[in-house]
């Protein structure tokens, strides 16, 4: 049976993990909807501390990091990737409410960026679908190769490009394809 818990404001994430399986879904959803903090205090070995700012969005993460993050569901991997908090113990010492709010924010941003990536694909005509027969769907990891060829850079350099810049490249390419299609349709209609 699941229970509704009133979580103490300063409950640590390591303590929350012990009771997570019996926490009601409503409580988890409420925690995930709490405002994302603007920063967290990272304490290393409980001695040194530094303030880490939470980004307003994940548009500036590298393409390779985004692709890695979109395949991850592990709290510690995401905190290491986005906030550079690499030790499990350091994440466990953070407030549970903050960890859950930040994790929900990361997931929302990954979904938003994935949707934006999917929206950059121009719609295919039936003739194009027939000609391509699945050849044009390169997947997320093929995207690095496409960007490296487009920009004439190595795949390592392409993986380091910010996802926001990659989205701009893809939007420009989509607009070029749509423009060319419209132009061809105008030429066809004027010939008849």
Where are these regions (language model features)?
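An amphipathic, hydrophobic-aromatic interaction surface with interspersed Lys/Arg
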Residues: 1-192
